[in-house]
Design a protein with these regions (language model features):
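Alpha-helical cap/lid subdomain in secreted, periplasmic
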Residues: 38, 57-213
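Serine-esterase "nucleophile elbow" of acetyl-processing enzymes
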Residues: 1-48, 52-54, 58-70, 75
């Protein structure tokens, strides 16, 4: 049995937007690990529409408040989709690739020096439903070509830093079970079934298992 407090730091895909059970993949992941006998505390620090540059100013303070050094703590970053998005009416991505990489480097380096750290990359969008307009006010256009480009760059960066990286873009894109929930969602946020599949991918990831088993 492993006792561990974990901060899941990210955006709406971390928060679980679109999941009618409001668990997202972190809640489902930790729920299943509890069934295996592990004593996990799950802190979901996902904020809708956050990019890497919006996460960067907040992650350390939010994690510090939840991970006192007297307890075993760890951090899982999960971001990138919003960096690749183009806001409707603009012709620029929200965070250019080089800026996104520099921001990710600073966060991952700082986190790794403090706590065990994992990085989970962006996942594929459903292009037939673009742009995504959940609020009715702002629309964001996601494209898999851009997501794939950022994903490859994040994977390379994580390798350089020695931070384990989960390529969800590849893992979900290659899994036929992703097709239905991807199409059933709004174009980027799947319903519950999609988050369950993401939780399954994380649960089977060797880097995650090393924390627990």
């Amino acid at each position: 049995m492993t006792a561990l407090r974990i901060c899941f730091v990210g955006d709406s895909l971390t928060a679980g937007t679109g999941d009618d059970r409001f668990l997202g993949w972190p809640g489902r992941l930790c729920q299943e690990e509890r069934k295996r006998g592990h004593d996990l505390t799950c802190y979901n620090l996902g904020i809708r529409a956050d990019t890497s540059t919006l996460i960067a100013p907040r992650w350390r303070a939010e994690c510090t408040a939840r991970l006192p050094d007297i307890y075993q703590g760890a951090i899982v970053f999960a971001f990138g989709n919003n960096d690749t998005a183009v806001q409707v009416g603009s012709d620029q991505v929200r965070v250019p690739l080089e800026e996104s990489l520099a921001t990710a480097r600073a966060m991952l380096s700082g986190a790794k020096a403090w706590k065990p750290t994992l990085f989970i990359g962006p996942w594929p969008c459903e292009e037939s439903k673009q742009p995504v307009n959940p609020s009715g006010l702002l629309g964001y256009d996601f494209r898999n070509t851009r997501i794939g480009e950022y994903n490859d760059a994040y994977a390379k960066l994580a390798g350089e830093l020695g931070v384990p990286y989960l390529d969800l873009y590849g893992a979900l894109g290659a899994d036929p079970r992703w097709l239905q929930p991807s199409r059933a969602g709004d174009g980027i946020h799947p319903p519950a079934e999609g988050y369950s599949l993401v939780a399954e991918k994380v649960a089977g990831w060797a880097a995650w298992r090393r924390w627990l088993d």
